[in-house]
């Protein structure tokens, strides 16, 4: 039962990532229809192929074994999807870009500045998201072990690198030479 809840949370996060690409662009009923179709036709098959030792795993009769196989039929290079890197981030990212291209620009795009209007709530949301990703990545090791610690540290290092890049980008954009 716990694993079902864990997997449903991953599906909810994947659809939430796509929702950021279509804010102010589609009606809610249309969005719910899209989510149902996307989870059924894209997310669930991809989860089965990557996380269940099927088509895209390290099993001997998969695509990775045929493309990068050794003489004994095992995959020499197999995808490692820790905490949903390909299933969640890649599939929802590509789907979000495709959806944004199909739907078109936002109505308010380039008409008014898109600044955060409630900075404490923005920071609270960022902190909650940070805690959630640390939990997802650490929890994907299914135990308090070295793998969970490495996942936690990698998540922290990636967040710090992103923050430094954001600060550098804001400094480059907002200052004049």
Describe each model-derived feature in a short phrase.
Residues 1-177:
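Hydrophobic alpha-helical transmembrane bundles of multi-pass membrane proteins
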């Amino acid at each position: 039962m716990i694993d079902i809840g864990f997997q449903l949370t991953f599906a909810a996060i994947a659809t939430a990532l796509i929702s950021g690409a279509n804010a102010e662009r589609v009606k809610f009923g249309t969005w719910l229809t899209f989510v149902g179709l996307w989870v059924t036709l894209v997310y669930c098959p991809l989860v089965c192929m990557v996380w269940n030792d099927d088509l895209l795993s390290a099993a001997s009769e998969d695509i990775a074994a045929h493309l990068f196989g050794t003489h004994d039929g095992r995959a020499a290079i197999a995808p490692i999807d820790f905490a949903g890197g390909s299933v969640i981030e890649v599939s929802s990212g590509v789907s979000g870009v495709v959806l944004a291209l199909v739907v078109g620009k936002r109505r308010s795009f380039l008409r008014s500045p898109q600044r955060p209007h409630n900075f404490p709530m923005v920071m609270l949301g960022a902190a909650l998201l940070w805690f959630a990703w640390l939990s997802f990545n650490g929890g994907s090791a299914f135990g308090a072990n070295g793998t969970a610690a490495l996942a936690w540290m990698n998540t922290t290092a990636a967040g710090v690198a992103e923050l430094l890049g954001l600060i550098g980008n804001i400094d480059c954009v907002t200052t004049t030479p």
